[in-house]
């Protein structure tokens, strides 16, 4: 078992060690550190609040009805949402738990940034989807609060996380620990499902951030 201050944590419970200097907070381009690859985990939501199981043809029909001006605004909305979320949530995570908290902040900022883009995309185009997406975003904000992710439900007073982590190598990275937080997995799967149903290409977003996020692990 490694401490949260260690560079490469072991799978399972880990003790927070005192006296370790925190890592340098993320900086540079506001969009650099908010993009990231998401784990291919199954959705943990029992009920899909957006009813995303409607036919793909219907989804494409809805999106094709969006005026070209709105589509242009959508692109700006995704970028603005991702940019605005980055600094806030990474800093909150950094303040709460150094390396692990900062990596959780990266994932939270990414998820909420994409959801902000969805909300902006439907505003003025489809009132029902706008309201439903806004509700999803509001719920995500509450469940993904850094204080909630690092609460005693998930991390003990001694700094031990209690969710199972599987790394590519023997010692998983903090990025892997953060990605496999049950609440993060749930919302990552939700965002991926929404993007797939609405034809939003998150792969392009993920590629931009992949190498930079690796440096934060």
UniProtKB/Swiss-Prot annotation:
Keywords of this protein's UniProt record, alphabetized?
A: Cytoplasm, Nucleus
Region Disordered, annotated ranges: 1-52
Region: deca-GX3 motif; residue ranges are: 77-117
The subcellular localization recorded is:
Cytoplasm; Nucleus
- Name the Pfam families for this protein: Yae1_N
Q: Does the entry feature the keyword Cytoplasm, yes or no?
A: yes
Source domain of life is Eukaryota
Principal place where this protein is found?
A: cytoplasm
Query: Would you tell me the Gene Ontology cellular component terms?
Result: cytoplasm; nucleus
Q: Assembly and interactions? A: May form a complex with LTO1.
Say which family it is in: Belongs to the YAE1 family.
Name of the protein this chain belongs to: Protein YAE1
Organism field = Phaeosphaeria nodorum (strain SN15 / ATCC MYA-4574 / FGSC 10173)
């Amino acid at each position: 078992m490694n401490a949260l201050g260690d560079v490469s944590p072991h799978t399972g419970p880990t003790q927070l060690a005192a006296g370790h200097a925190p890592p340098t907070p993320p900086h540079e381009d506001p969009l650099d550190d908010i993009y990231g690859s998401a784990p291919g985990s199954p959705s943990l939501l029992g009920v899909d609040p957006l009813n995303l199981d409607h036919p793909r043809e219907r989804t494409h029909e809805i999106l094709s009805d969006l005026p070209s001006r709105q589509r242009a605004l959508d692109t700006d909305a995704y970028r603005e949402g991702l940019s605005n979320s980055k600094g806030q949530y990474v800093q909150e995570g950094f303040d709460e738990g150094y390396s692990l908290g900062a990596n959780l902040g990266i994932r939270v900022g990414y998820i909420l940034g994409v959801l902000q883009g969805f909300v902006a995309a439907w505003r003025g185009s489809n009132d029902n989807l706008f309201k439903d997406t806004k509700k999803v975003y509001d719920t995500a904000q509450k469940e993904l609060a850094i204080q909630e992710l690092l609460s005693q439900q998930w991390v003990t007073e001694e700094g031990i996380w209690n969710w199972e982590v599987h790394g590519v190598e023997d010692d998983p990275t903090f990025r892997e620990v953060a990605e496999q937080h049950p609440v993060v997995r749930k919302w990552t799967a939700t965002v991926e499902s929404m993007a797939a149903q609405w034809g939003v290409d998150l792969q392009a977003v993920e590629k931009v951030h992949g190498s930079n996020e690796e440096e934060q692990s």
